Amino acid sequence: MRLAFVGLGKMGRSILKGALERGFLRPEEVGVLGRTPERSRELAEPFGVRPLTRADLGMAERVLIAVQPRDFPALAPEIAHHRLGYISIMAGISTSVLARRLDNRRVVRAMPNLAVVIGESSTALTALKEAREAEDLAFARALFATVGDVYEIPEHLFDAFTGMSASAPAYLAVVAEALADAGVKMGMPRALALRLAADALAATGELLKGRHPAQVKDEVASPGGTTIHGLHALEARAVRAAFYEAVEAATRRGHELGESE
């Protein structure tokens, strides 16, 4: 068995789905462990993979931990095996804490974002030396490449990555909602306003892949036109500063979660 999933929430299911659809994993190479044998069967059945008990984990080459961080301290002794590699997608839990709790230094830390559900995640990876040497990091890189882009970054940047990239879908959803509400205020039907806001964000994302943000802004904002007046209103409300503060607050909270361990 190449990979055992411990827990299978929204992100875990999306990772498994992407790996199966892209052919990186076959169903017979995967197992899923839930809180109870019944839950393991419920989680495994839709994907045609194997339901596991805790005793079965030792048959896996690697384990992907996809539980809530608060559940990990109690769970760790039950899933710890010296010969396995571990990949964690739990927010705020460092590689050093993973290694200590699991009594195993073959650990990879990963941070995908919500776009994993559509195969467009930006996933950060970091790993201890032992995980690199055992090719656990290479395995994780290939696994997460099935659901988006992968970035290997130093662990000291993980909280900032979480505060900016992992949280970005929520920030941008607020932007989309605010744009739509503004359109409704101007008399636009809500369904149309929501669709236009979503289309605008998607199109802007594509434009930004090949351009600096300032270039996109300048191309839209003609002298004396409507857009530059709208931008002036945003600057007057310190929208840039609000994003700075949001990323700083989320980064700080990620650090606090790690410190609590």
Swiss-Prot record:
Going by the UniProt record, its keywords in alphabetical order are: Amino-acid biosynthesis, Cytoplasm, NADP, Oxidoreductase, Proline biosynthesis
Per its record, the protein catalyses:
L-proline + NADP(+) = (S)-1-pyrroline-5-carboxylate + NADPH + 2 H(+); L-proline + NAD(+) = (S)-1-pyrroline-5-carboxylate + NADH + 2 H(+)
Query: Which species is listed as the source?
Result: Thermus thermophilus (strain ATCC BAA-163 / DSM 7039 / HB27)
InterPro entries, A to Z? 6-PGluconate_DH-like_C_sf (IPR008927), NAD(P)-bd_dom_sf (IPR036291), P5C_Rdtase_cat_N (IPR028939), P5CR-like_CS (IPR053790), P5CR_dimer (IPR029036), Pyrroline-COOH_reductase (IPR000304)
Organism lineage string: Bacteria, Thermotogati, Deinococcota, Deinococci, Thermales
Which pathway does the UniProt entry assign to this protein?
Answer: Amino-acid biosynthesis; L-proline biosynthesis; L-proline from L-glutamate 5-semialdehyde: step 1/1
| Free-text function comment from the UniProt entry | Catalyzes the reduction of 1-pyrroline-5-carboxylate (PCA) to L-proline.
Q: What is this protein called?
A: Pyrroline-5-carboxylate reductase
Tell me which Pfam families the record gives: F420_oxidored, P5CR_dimer
GO cellular component terms, semicolon-separated? cytoplasm
